[in-house]
Amino acid sequence: MTKWFAYILLASVCLLLSCGGKSVREKFAEADRLVNENNLDSAAWLLEEQITLSALSDSDKAEYGRRLAWLHLLQGRSLVNDSLIDYSVDYYKEHASEPLLSAYFVKAIYMGDSRKGLEQRRALYREAIDSAYSRSDSTYLVRFYDRLTSLSFGEGLYRETIAESKEWEASPKAGFKEMAYYMAGLSYSRL
């Protein structure tokens, strides 16, 4: 009889403890609030210590990877260990989700921090530009063109930088054309 009582008591305590916590979405909202208040360390603690990755659904896992990598970027931390951003980009591409462009942006920075190959990073920017163009998102279109031309220029690929700058300049949806002219001019001066 005491054995059954102990089992019932243990089950009740477990049930009581499991009901008291916030949902993952509430924790994400709380982390967003902390980031907006510039409490980055508290937001990092919340995401890194209070969320169990193995218990997340696929969509929550993608969101977790994107948010954590973005937070590390805001903190100025290296993104070398944020390989979950790969999962986030793949998930958002597969489901045509809204956060895809910000995930691309963070993944490109992650690839730079982890010293991925130049062609891989250029291909990622190309893919991101296509996605931003199809969504008519001029903000991310400018960001991705800027990063792509800067990457190419930094690697000494001046002819490619000129071609990318001309493409940027010809794009009806991308703004900041003066940056495209500037990158093309710099590249012409190096030929």
Tell what function each PLM region has.
Residues 7-16:
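Bacterial N-terminal signal peptides
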Residues 19-191:
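A "functional boundary" signal
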Residues 1-6:
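Positively charged n-region of N-terminal signal peptides that target proteins for export
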